Structures are given as structure tokens and as C-alpha cells.
Amino acid sequence: MPFHLAPYLAKSVPGVGVLGALVGGAAALAKNVRLLKEKRITNTEAAIDTGKETVGAGLATALSAVAATAVGGGLVVSLGTALVAGVAAKYAWDRGVDLVEKELNRGKAANGASDEDILRDELA
């Protein structure tokens, strides 16, 4: 018997978030592969951007599911709520990531470390 991933993931909010992360991550990866081929970004930049977009899409999708469920209502109300909550969550995620990156870049400028050095230190 085949395994049906989407219905399985749709049974829970974390599952819905995982599904959103898969879709958002795939879209980010497709974008970054094109940018890599055009030599507009490095491998490290592509990996970091893909990771950020994957997590952001998953969180936004999960939050939109929670909001739509909490509000209830008809199809239009549920879709509208999911859209507004998803946009707000993704905006907040992106803004938070931007602030963290500014702080990291400020520290990087102070000690002269490259993105690769910082990533290597974080993974060690």
C-alpha cells in the first residue's frame, strides 16, 4: 500500500508546517540554483537563504493553519484569515532574520570574519 504524505501531514499543525516548509524550501532552492548557475551568489549564500526560507515558510504555514482553525467561519473567512496570518508570520520571520543578520554582520565587521568562517564556527 502506498504512503500518502500530504494527508498524513495535514492531520496536525506541525505536519502542516512541515508541508509548508517543503514547498517553501523547494521554491527557495529552485531560485537559488538559478542564481548559483548565474554566479550571482555563493554556495554558502544559497544554503543559508534556502534554510531561512524553508523555516520561514513552515512557520508561516503552521501559524496560518492555527489562525484559520481558531477563527473558523466559512471558506472565504478561513482563506482570508489564513492569508493574513501567513503574510504576517512570514513578514515577522523575515524582519527578525534581517535584524539578526545585521547584528552578526556588525560583529563580523569588528573581527573581520567571513560568512564561511562564521558558519564553520557555528557548526563546530
From Swiss-Prot:
It comes from Paramagnetospirillum magneticum (strain ATCC 700264 / AMB-1). The gene is mamC. Foreign proteins fused to the N-terminal membrane-targeted domain of this protein are expressed on the magnetosome membrane, subsequent purification of the fusion protein occurs by extracting the organelles from the lysed bacteria using magnets. In this study human thyroid-stimulating hormone receptor (TSHR) and class II major histocompatibility complex (MHC II) were expressed and purified; expression is better when the endogenous gene is deleted. The keyword Transcription does not apply. This bacteria makes up to 20 cubo-octahedral magnetosomes of about 45 nm in diameter which contain membrane-bound crystals of magnetite (Fe(3)O(4)). The chain crosses the membrane at residues 9-29, 65-85. This is Magnetosome protein MamC. The lumenal magnetite interacting component (MIC, residues 36-56) binds magnetite in vitro when fused C-terminally to maltose-binding protein. Isolated MIC binds poorly to Fe(2+), Fe(3+), or Ni(2+), but improves quality of iron particles during iron co-precipitation experiments. The lumenal loop (MIC) probably has to form a helix to interact with magnetite. Residues 30-64 are lumenal. It is found in: Magnetosome membrane. Probably interacts with MamA. Residues 2-8, 86-124 are cytoplasmic. Keywords: Biomineralization, Iron, Magnetosome, Membrane, Metal-binding, Transmembrane, Transmembrane helix. Disruption phenotype: No growth phenotype, magnetite crystals are slightly smaller with a wild-type surface. Deletion of the probable mamGFDC operon leads to a slight reduction in magnetic response and slightly narrower magnetite crystals. Residues 36-56 are annotated as: MIC, when fused with the C-terminus of maltose-binding protein (MBP) or expressed as a fragment, improves quality of iron particles during precipitation experiments, binds magnetite.
